[in-house]
């Protein structure tokens, strides 16, 4: 039995969230009656309203009137008035991943998982399949620039989704193709131990049916170890590793992107094949690896080399993934979602490859618990930045932790050998600080998952206002 057409209205609590908004949009495009609520106005809320979805700002019991089902994310607390009202009225309550799983049952599905790179890789897979006239349905964790949204309903038989592992519910997703980009210690508030994180990714791959396949990056030692533990499933490995089934070769920086080729070796057939002259308009080895994952999926699904080559060269990127927000006196301002040490190091390496001048990092640490648990890693991931400007921790709903704050982080960076670390008093001070250190040719990279994105977009204008 599949999701019946007559069900509805479907009420989303926290509909403006990036994951929730994509599911709501696809359901609406399928013809279901969708409504919802969110704590505040946002671009996602406005976009969904334009599609005719009724959205209330603020959470109250009256909002769920007439709803047949309630969809909630893990961010919704158990004492949320809409959730309490639904349970009192015995209205079914489903988690976001469960509703996504229902949508996935309507198509053949590709699910992209990993601690980092999920959103970009999902977007790349979607772009390649689009170019191959597959016309996929897409539900992503970020705004795809080519679509202007994070979701679209396609007429084809395939669906491409970002599989969020943060609460373990990605194990509910019925994927025919699973991609694992990397596995690092993250979301330990849910998993408790890194061993539990690795077990979850192993189960994610083993859940793929016998007629499907997994694409896994063996450049990452934890993923390579997982490959060795998975039995009875077809796995295509990728990376620069000489043992990879899809091997990244001849990677070179080229302007604001990179060029490379991919060599395929089929273990069963004993054949080899190369896709040459590939160009990706995004900098950084990490993005080239994401592209190889997408290419491996597209190649396995039968897309031609020429289609892959053209689609990759035309890839428009994802919002908040090395996004240029403007310039000032020859200084380039970049906004990036990177908030984990591995992501930050990769983004700064990409920035270093993009300019021969200075790289200035502006970081807003995201969550006290993350800064605490990965403090050593945070103190050593800014090596490619000439200057680090440190803002206050963005709490994301967490209570402060004694000794885990901006000033402690600044001291940690200095103690680990960083030459220039500047504490930022507040966002209003940012333009003045940047103007004091940035010169023509420099890159200013704003990093974080909090409201620093607003600073990044405001910064070019604020710098110009200084004269």
Curated annotation (Swiss-Prot):
Pfam families: Mur_ligase, Mur_ligase_C, Mur_ligase_M
SUPFAM superfamilies according to UniProt: MurCD N-terminal domain, MurD-like peptide ligases, catalytic domain, MurD-like peptide ligases, peptide-binding domain
Single GO MF annotation: UDP-N-acetylmuramate-L-alanine ligase activity
Catalysis performed (reactions): UDP-N-acetyl-alpha-D-muramate + L-alanine + ATP = UDP-N-acetyl-alpha-D-muramoyl-L-alanine + ADP + phosphate + H(+)
EC number: 6.3.2.8
Pathway assigned to this chain's UniProt record: Cell wall biogenesis; peptidoglycan biosynthesis
Gene Ontology terms describing biological process: cell division; cell wall organization; peptidoglycan biosynthetic process; regulation of cell shape
GO cellular component, one term: cytoplasm
Compartments reported by the entry: Cytoplasm
Positions with a binding annotation for ATP: 114-120
Keywords annotated in UniProt: ATP-binding, Cell cycle, Cell division, Cell shape, Cell wall biogenesis/degradation, Cytoplasm, Ligase, Nucleotide-binding, Peptidoglycan synthesis
Coarse class of the protein's main subcellular location: cytoplasm
Function of the molecule: Cell wall formation.
Family according to the record: Belongs to the MurCDEF family.
NCBIfam families: murC (TIGR01082)
Record's protein name: UDP-N-acetylmuramate--L-alanine ligase
Biological source species: Rhodopseudomonas palustris (strain BisB5)
